[in-house]
Amino acid sequence: MNKPDLIEKQNRLAELKENNVSLKSQISGFEVKNAIEDLPKVQELEKTLSENSIEIIKIENELNAQEEKPKGKDKMTNFIESQNAVTEFFDVLKKNSGKSEIKNAWSAKLAENGVTITDTTFQLPRKLVESINTALLNTNPVFKVFHVTNVGALLVSRSFDSANEAQVHKDGQTKTEQAATLTIDTLEPVMVYKLQSLAERVKRLQMSYSELYNLIVAELTQAIVNKIVDLALVEGDGTNGFKSIDKEADVKKIKKITTKAKSAGKTPFADAIEEAVDFVRPTAGRRYLIVKTEDRKALLDELRQATANANVRIKNDDTEIASEVGVDEIIVYTGSKALKPTVLVDQKYHIDMQDLTKVDAFEWKTNSNMILVETLTSGHVETYNAGAVITVS
């Protein structure tokens, strides 16, 4: 790289970093406001931030490689942490079909670059791992509420129930036996997958690094997370690896509430949410209200029309609405399922899913030009007084 090119790269890097600081500040401003109408603006800013970050990584790697050449450093030393490792992984993915072939080819590529991995599932490039982990947290606003583990085992729920108090024993008296019930439920994990075919244009281009990167991190990861959220909230019926909050039959874990009839000046929806909050009060943790957009609007309209608020206009602000009904945060569900308003305590729904940052989560279907990402997963409500589901009459 000649000196003018080097200076141009350095200037571009400084410009991108400065832009990212500004973008993060703008995003933070919208997050404080937390208004639903600002969501498209936030998504556009986050997209630009992501594109800038990818370009920053690329330029930094080019500059680092330029610095290392005169010093005679071994370019293989930090292979697993480099951008080149990501490109090489996608090259392995495109050239090999089947999980075992991909694992063997990636193992050979790591060895070729002086990297020894003791984990039998092998380690993905660090930058891809970080991007996937970030995507898992950011692609669906509900996902953060769940307690997520990567054990890959059968989920077992043990509930010990006794309504009797401890007793005081006096000398000479016989201790009275007290009844208790221990229930054990198990859920067999299921495979949640996303099998994505590639457009003709992409086939002809043989899929560039950036397109593959975006496909895996953005689209495929998000699709899997969205499906897991739907299973946890609504779809899980005990036969598909999940027992959803909506279909949980144990009334000590999830309370089912139906709102009272609507009448002028009354707040049956808000009252039902407060009843749900009272139910989960014994359980420590942040309390979330998960609702569809139309239910959030219905709640806001009801609060504004309440007799008690006749002279006060409730702001169209999640924080203010949440404080009115006693929850810590409102999350707007963006999926397509028939979700009922749900109150859930943080980390009280347990999901176990196979780690998406392991190489055996990926498979390239060469014959049909498809890419497969999958995870073995299951989920259930973990504790008593974990949440409530509200039917709006």
UniProtKB/Swiss-Prot annotation:
Keywords: Capsid protein, Coiled coil, T=7 icosahedral capsid protein, Virion. Probably cleaved by the viral protease during maturation. Residues 5-69 form a coiled coil. This is Capsid protein. Disulfide bonds: none annotated. Its main location: virion. One of its GO terms (cellular component) is T=7 icosahedral viral capsid. Homomultimer. Capsid protein self-assembles to form an icosahedral capsid with a T=7 symmetry, about 69 nm in diameter, and consisting of 60 capsid proteins hexamers and 11 pentamers. The capsid encapsulates the genomic DNA. It is found in: Virion. Belongs to the Skunalikevirus capsid protein family.
